[in-house]
Amino acid sequence: MNTDEIYAKIPHGKDDKPFLLFEPNKVMEYDIYDVDGPFAMTNKELVGCNVVLPFSKPMRTDIAGIATVNGKSVPVVVAMSQIWNMDIWWAGIKFGGALREYGQKATVTVSGFVDTDGNEMIPAQFTVHTAEKVKAKKEDIVHEKVALNAAEEGIVLLKNENGTLPLSVDETLNVFGKGQHEFRFCAIGAGKTNPRYNVSFLEAAEHSRFMLNSELSEFYACGEDTLPPEELVTKAKEKSDKAIMLISRSMGEGFDATSRKGEFYATDEEDALLKFLRKNFAKVIVILNTGYPIGTEFLEGADAILYTGFGGMLAGQAIVNVLNGTVNPSGKLPDTWAKRYEDIPSSKNFYNAVEGKPRIGTDCGEIWLDTVYEEGIYVGYRYFQTFGKEVGFPFGFGLSYTNFSIRAKGISYDGKSLHFTAEVANTGKVAGKETVQIYLKKPNGKIEKPVRELVDFEKTRLLSPKEMQTFSFSVPNSSMTSYDEETSSYVMEKGIYEVFVGSSVAAEKAGEFRLTADKTVQTVKPVMRPIEEIKELSQKDEKGTYPTGARSGVKEGITYL
C-alpha cells in the first residue's frame, strides 16, 4: 500500500476532527540523547522536538495547543514538512529536562490544536519509555579512550579572564539555561552518530567530584531560558559565586542556518539571562555547544568561554575534564568568529531566511536559488586579515591554562621548499599542548592575494612546564602558489614571501625569502569558468568591489540550469 492509499483511508473531510497518528497500545521508545528527533532536517521548527507525530489533516500553526508529560506542561509546536511527496503536519514535542532518566515511563498528552477547517483535535494520550542505560564494555575501552581524547582536544578555550578556569574539584556547578537539557553530541541527518551510549554534560557533572546544583537544573527542565526566581538565585550564590550558562544550537543537513535570533544571534532570553548572571555572580562561564560560529557581541561580559562543538559520545565527560583541570584545553578555531553576521562579505549573497523570507531546504520543490560568490578569495580569515576588520575570535585561536613561547629558526628556501625549525616551550606552570601555525604573505603582483594564508601546522605532545619540542617544517612550492586564471596555472610570483609563525592567524613575522622570477608549479585544464563575469572583491578597490548581492537569490521561473 502506497502513501496515497494510506492517506485515503484516514478520515480527513471538512467536518472530521484531526487526530494524531500513532499505535495507541504501543509504548514509544525514546532515546533521551536524541535531542532533535528524526524529522528536524525536514523543518527547522522541529529542532529540539524529541517525539514527532503526524496529524491526520492540515493544521493551523497560529493556534497554540498543549502538551504534558506526567501532567507537567512541556513545549510543543506544529510544523509542516514534505515527506513521501506529501505535505504532512506534525506535532513536535520538546521533552527537554522533563524526561532525562534512563528506563523511565511517562504519560504524554497532546490537545488543543485546530485544523485549517476550524475543528479542534481529538485529544491524544500515549506512553513513552526512555531507553535503558547501556553500560560500558571492557572490550570497548580502547575505542572510548579515542572518542574521549578527540572530544577533549577539540574543546577551544576562547576566554579565561583572571584564571576563572579551571575550577576547584569540589566546586558547586550552578548551571543556567535550557541548553543543559538540549545538549548535543552530533549534527542531524548524515552528521548524526549512533554510538553505544552517550554521556551528557549534566550526567558527567553528576558523576564527578563537582556538586551539581540539581534544584537549578530542575528549574530549567521547563525548556525555556527563563530568569530564575530570587530565592533560587540566593541559594545558588550561597553554594558558589560562579555561574555557568550552557548555550546549544542544532545544525545539520536539509536547511541552512540563518542570522535569526536563536541561530547566529542570541535570543532575547539568552541575552537577558547572561546579563542577569553578570549582575548577580562574581564569575560567569559560558559553554557553547554549537556546531557553527555564532555572533559574539553578547558574550563580551563573560569571564570564561568554552567552545565545545559537537564532541561525540563522551562530549559531556570531556567538558567536565576541562572544567576541573584534568585536561588542559588545546583546541583551535577552524574558522573566524565574526562579531556580527553583516561583517561577513558573503552575507550579501548567501540566502538568509529572515524578515519574512521562507526557509529553503533540499526538498522545497523546484526552486532555483542562485548564489554569486562576489567575495572571491576573501573567505573567512583571508578577508578579515586582509582588510583589517575586527573579529570576535580569530582563525586558529585557542587559549590554554599555561603559556607557550614559539621561536622559528633557520628560515631558508631552496627553490623547491621553504625550510625552518620551530621551538615550542611551555613557559607556564601546568602541562599542556600547543599548535604551531605557519602563515605566508605572498608578494603583490598580477594575481590577487590575501595577506595571510595558512600553509602548515603541527601540534605538540603534552609538554610539562619548561619542556620544549622542536619541529622541522618543509613547505613545498605547491603549498605556496596562487592560481592564475589567464594561464590556468598555479604560480609563485616573483617578490618577497613573508613567513609568520605563531599560535593563530595573528602570528608574528619570523622571516622571509625572495623569488627573483615567476615560477609556474602546475598547469591545469580550465573548467567551470563562470558564464558571466563576476566582479570580485579586491584590495585595489574595496568600496567599488564589495559584494552587493544584487545577482543572488531566488530566480523566478527558473528551475534548472
Give a label for each model feature.
Residues 37-44, 408-413:
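Short beta-strand segments of immunoglobulin-like
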Residues 45, 83-85, 115, 484-485:
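Acidic/polar residues at beta-strand termini and the immediately following turn/coil
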Residues 45-54, 415-421:
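Contiguous beta-strand segments within globular domains
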Residues 46-48, 84-88, 99-103, 413-415, ...:
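Surface-exposed coil/turn segments at beta-strand junctions on protein surfaces, enriched
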